From Swiss-Prot:
Catalyzes the formation of NAD(+) from nicotinamide mononucleotide (NMN) and ATP. Involved in the salvage pathway for NAD(+) biosynthesis via NMN. Belongs to the eukaryotic NMN adenylyltransferase family. POF1 subfamily. It is found in: Cytoplasm; Nucleus. This is Putative nicotinamide mononucleotide adenylyltransferase. Keywords: ATP-binding, Cytoplasm, NAD, Nucleotide-binding, Nucleotidyltransferase, Nucleus, Pyridine nucleotide biosynthesis, Transferase. One of its GO terms (cellular component) is nucleus. It catalyses: beta-nicotinamide D-ribonucleotide + ATP + H(+) = diphosphate + NAD(+). It comes from the Eukaryota. Its EC number is 2.7.7.1. It comes from Schizosaccharomyces pombe (strain 972 / ATCC 24843). Pathway: Cofactor biosynthesis; NAD(+) biosynthesis; NAD(+) from nicotinamide D-ribonucleotide: step 1/1. Signal peptide: none annotated. ATP binds at H48, T214, R215, A216, R217. GO terms for biological process: NAD biosynthetic process.
Length: 249
């Protein structure tokens, strides 16, 4: 696929540049909040699409891929192949203006700063799953400084919209209780006022139930087409069949 080579070249140029974030599509200047779906997109699935379709009509949305991950090694699919899949995901989102973006930062506070520098000082709303929320508030990622000190700038200009769904043995009740513990200052190193910046919501219907990138990859590698269709939009499956990003597994 010529597009795969194009994105491979783009990534090479980006890595060697002084830029720390790159938007593949231009967004109009605005003072309205910008929504950010930061994910590995490995591959994009129905839960990703459901999150994107849940934001207010007419909003601006970044599909953000970090080429530096805090705790996940680089594995198939390659980054240029993920961008191809992200661009296809973008075509399925009709309620807002979307740009695919790549960045060099692993931590959300650094991503937030880069977006502010690129798009101006506007509120950012991060669309995350519960597993990502837990990682954002995990002290192990902030060893050099206290987590409160590092994350305060992030929460001063950002909100987290956390999509609660039962996955990996964690119930929605467990997730709601976690936020209640933050509100009541029952979790060490997490100020209670941060709970005002975190909102729990749910995807409509059964969208996202049992969906994860790990399960999607397993279904692709094993050839389980029925599970693939349940987890991954057909348009993205069509791209996967052409570029075969998991062929080396």
């Amino acid at each position: 696929m010529d597009q795969a080579k194009k994105y491979a070249n783009l990534l090479d140029s980006f890595r060697s540049s002084t830029e720390d974030i790159l938007l593949l599509e231009r967004l109009e200047v605005s003072d309205k909040p910008i929504y950010v779906l930061d994910s590995s997109f490995n591959p994009p699935h129905f839960a990703h699409l459901g999150m994107c379709l849940s934001i207010p009509k007419g909003s601006q949305l970044l599909l953000l891929l970090s080429i530096t991950n805090a705790d996940k090694p680089v594995a198939p699919a390659a980054f240029n192949e993920r961008i191809l899949m992200m661009e296809k995901l973008k075509t399925l989102i009709h309620n807002c203006t979307v740009s695919v973006a790549i960045c060099k930062h692993a931590l959300f506070v650094d991503k937030c700063r880069s977006i502010s520098n690129k798009l101006g000082p506007r509120e950012q709303v991060y669309l995350v799953g519960f597993d990502t929320l837990i990682r954002i508030l995990d002290c192990k990622y902030y060893k050099e400084k206290a987590m409160q000190q590092v994350l305060q700038p992030f929460f001063s200009c950002s909100q987290i919209l956390c999509f609660s769904r039962e996955v990996d043995g964690t119930t929605t009740d467990d997730q709601a209780q976690y936020l209640e513990k933050i509100k009541k200052s029952l979790l060490p190193n997490i100020p209670s006022q941060w709970s005002e910046k975190i909102k729990l919501t749910k995807l409509k219907g059964n969208v996202g139930f049992g969906v994860s990138s790990t399960r999607a990859r397993q279904a692709i590698i094993s050839g389980d087409e029925e599970t693939q269709r349940k987890i991954i939009p057909q348009e993205i499956l069509n791209v996967i069949k052409v570029i075969q990003p998991y062929r080396h597994r």
